[in-house]
Amino acid sequence: MEKVYARTKGIRDDMVSGFCPGCMHSTVIKLIGEVLEEMHLLDKAACAVGVGCCGLHMDYITYDYFLAAHGRACAVATGAKRSNPESLVFTYQGDGDLASIGLAETISAANRGENFTVIFVNN
């Protein structure tokens, strides 16, 4: 039988979602893993993870990550990208982490033209 769908290599296969029913985090995490696998970037990816529900992100992924202090994921991602320019660095942050306490770091990183991606999940 032809396999139509398989779990992405970007997500651990021994984990079951612990997010609340209807929460979009599990969908976003799955999509990130699928895109990184499809583009052959799993071994180059590094994610700065915010706190709160976003912090659960690290339990499900197979690529590199680091947990940042509340609101400081963009500052941590800046250091990661500058120290390893060839890596694909991105942040994964929720609304409280990014739009509340971390807005100054996010705007400052954008103003400096830092070369990383911010994934903002308004949960």
Residues covered by each model-derived region:
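Thiamine diphosphate
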Residues: 51-123
